[in-house]
């Protein structure tokens, strides 16, 4: 093939190809201000139009490599749909996790729905309070085991504890005899467990 024939083919290909760069103008319709619009809104519209006027004409590059045997990789719609579905499922699981957490933390059953941040803060406070309760329980148990405290509580106090509505009473408190009355701190901790 001769060089002039190649040039004719490339000229013919250029006739069928869209231009590499073209100018796109935004159509802006100016309308007279209505009687309902104030002068302030008209001046805002004018400022908006002036600020966007440099963008009225801009070069948009459209390159078509199809005639040269090249193609740009296109995102597969199926892959995008699967990715979006995975993200929706992930968000749903996170939201379900927060809903479950709201049910287990104090103030979670209140009328006002707690935000995610409030739920996390409440869970942290709840865990700290439970940890403190366990630490104090371990300290009391260690004191009983070392013999510092003697298990002598009056039967009246045990009966009072059993008669309190909604208060958690251990099964061994009435079965195994009497113990010393609880200190105000220990009583407060028992009251704390009634919140839940």
Curated annotation (Swiss-Prot):
GO terms for biological process: adenohypophysis development; axon regeneration; cell dedifferentiation; embryonic digestive tract development; epithelial cell maturation; hindbrain morphogenesis; intestinal epithelial cell differentiation; negative regulation of gene expression. Disruption phenotype: In pituitary absent (pia) mutants, adenohypophyseal cells fail to express hormone genes and some become apoptotic. It is found in: Nucleus. Keywords: Developmental protein, Differentiation, DNA-binding, Neurogenesis, Nucleus, Transcription, Transcription regulation. Gene3D superfamilies: Helix-loop-helix DNA-binding domain (4.10.280.10). The keyword Translocase does not apply. SUPFAM superfamilies: HLH, helix-loop-helix DNA-binding domain. One of its GO terms (cellular component) is RNA polymerase II transcription regulator complex. In the 24 hours embryo, expressed in the dorsal hindbrain in two bilaterally symmetrical lines of cells marking the boundary between the alar and basal plates, and ventrally in rhombomere 1 near the floor plate. Also expressed in embryonic adenohypophysis, telencephalon, diencephalon, epiphysis, ventral tegmentum, neural retina and spinal cord, in discrete regions distinct from those expressing ascl1b. In the 30 hours embryo, hindbrain expression is in stripes adjacent to rhombomere boundaries. Residues 33-54, 159-186 are annotated as: Disordered. InterPro entries: bHLH_dom, HLH_DNA-bd_sf, MASH1/Ascl1a-like. Residues 78-130 form the bHLH domain. Residues 33-44, 159-176 have a biased composition (Polar residues). Coiled coil: none annotated. The keyword DNA-binding applies. It comes from the Eukaryota. Efficient DNA binding requires dimerization with another bHLH protein. Transcriptional regulator. May mediate transcription activation by binding to the E box-containing promoter. Involved in neurogenesis. Required for the development of neurons in the epiphysis, acting partially redundantly with neurog1 and downstream of flh. Involved in maintaining rhombomere boundaries in the hindbrain, probably via up-regulation of delta expression. Also involved in pituitary development; required cell-autonomously in adenohypophyseal cells for endocrine differentiation and for survival of a subset of cells. This is Achaete-scute homolog 1a. The gene is ascl1a.
């Amino acid at each position: 093939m001769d060089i002039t024939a190649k040039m004719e083919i490339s000229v013919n290909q250029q006739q069928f190809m869209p231009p590499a760069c073209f100018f796109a103008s935004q159509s802006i319709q100016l309308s007279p201000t209505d009687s309902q619009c104030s002068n302030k809104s008209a001046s805002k519209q004018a400022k908006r139009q002036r600020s966007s006027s440099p963008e009225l004409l801009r070069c948009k590059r459209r390159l078509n490599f199809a005639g040269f045997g090249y193609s740009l990789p296109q995102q597969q719609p199926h892959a995008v749909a699967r990715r979006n579905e995975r993200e929706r499922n992930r968000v749903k699981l996170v939201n379900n996790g927060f809903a479950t957490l709201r049910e287990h933390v104090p103030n979670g059953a209140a009328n006002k729905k707690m935000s995610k941040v409030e739920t996390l803060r409440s869970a942290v406070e709840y865990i700290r309070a439970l940890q403190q309760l366990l630490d104090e329980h371990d300290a009391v148990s260690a004191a009983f085991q070392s013999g510092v405290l003697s298990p002598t509580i009056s039967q009246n106090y045990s009966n009072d504890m059993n008669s309190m509505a909604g208060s958690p009473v251990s099964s061994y408190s009435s079965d195994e005899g009497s113990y010393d009355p609880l200190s105000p701190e220990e009583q407060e901790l028992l009251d704390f467990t009634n919140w839940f």
